[in-house]
Amino acid sequence: ETSGSIIFSLDDKYIFYSKLDNNHRARKIYRHKIGNFDDEDELIFEEKSEAFTVSIGISSDEKYYFILTSDHNTSEQYYFSINEKIPKPKLIIKRERGILYSVSSWNGKFYNHTNKDAEDFKIDISESLEKQNWKPFITPKNEVLVGGCIFLKKWIIRSETSDALDKLFVRNISTNKEEELIFSDEKVCVPNISLKQKDRNTDEIYIGYSSPKTPSRVYSYNLLTKSKKLVKEQEIPSGHNPDDYIVERVEYESHDGRMVPLTITRHKKTKIDGSANLLL
């Protein structure tokens, strides 16, 4: 009957959870007081559309609960304060068919990751949700998929994808200076980041990545000193030396005239005279 996903309140007095409808979609959010019977649980939000599903989470700065309701290409979000004794979710932006958005809060500001007037997404910023005044934070870019943000006390980290390559960018909050986070000399890799500690008062993060020639690796990375330390690496039982392989990045013209990126991985001893087999 429930989705299995729960959120504990910061005071550890309540549990927020969602209930499933007959189509196995989460459409109701309840609050359960620990120690009470479940028939006393409070319904705090209900999605009326059978096509939408709901979820609840806590903001990065732990000041708000956010309720997200969405289908495949449309979303809508509500919020209420961590300190509200009787939760009354308030609408952020009314849903609009084909528009996705996700609002997060950090350091007294609100960040909206949305495809409104931006096919490949953008990020807007506002000082308030009661009196919204959205201004550009990351503007839309031609053929660049703009990802969301991860917040630390001193840093904002975000992602971009262009030409089928993923990139990470780091912004120093105090200077507002942003630069690309380059942690490997491999151009073709798939990076991802995760928090190293919950309170976010740190300069260190975990960066995981893999590439066509390199097994999955996880590094501890210092955003201030830009130093890194390998903490985990996927073991290949048969043995593997990344230096034995060459990864090349080329582009070919498609039937519609667009250039399509192609990654070629080969052993450094492989002849490139057309005699070797190719797995495409």
Task: For the regions a language model picked out, list residue spans one by one.
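Conserved loop/turn motif of beta-propeller repeat scaffolds
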Residues: 12, 62, 107, 153-155, ...
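Hydrophobic beta-strand positions that form the internal "hydrophobic ladder"
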Residues: 15, 65, 110-112, 156, ...
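Polar, glycine-rich mid-to-C-terminal structural blocks
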Residues: 26-70
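Non-catalytic accessory segments flanking enzyme active sites
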Residues: 53-81, 86-104, 136, 147-148, ...
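Generic long, charged, amphipathic alpha-helical segments
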Residues: 130-152, 161
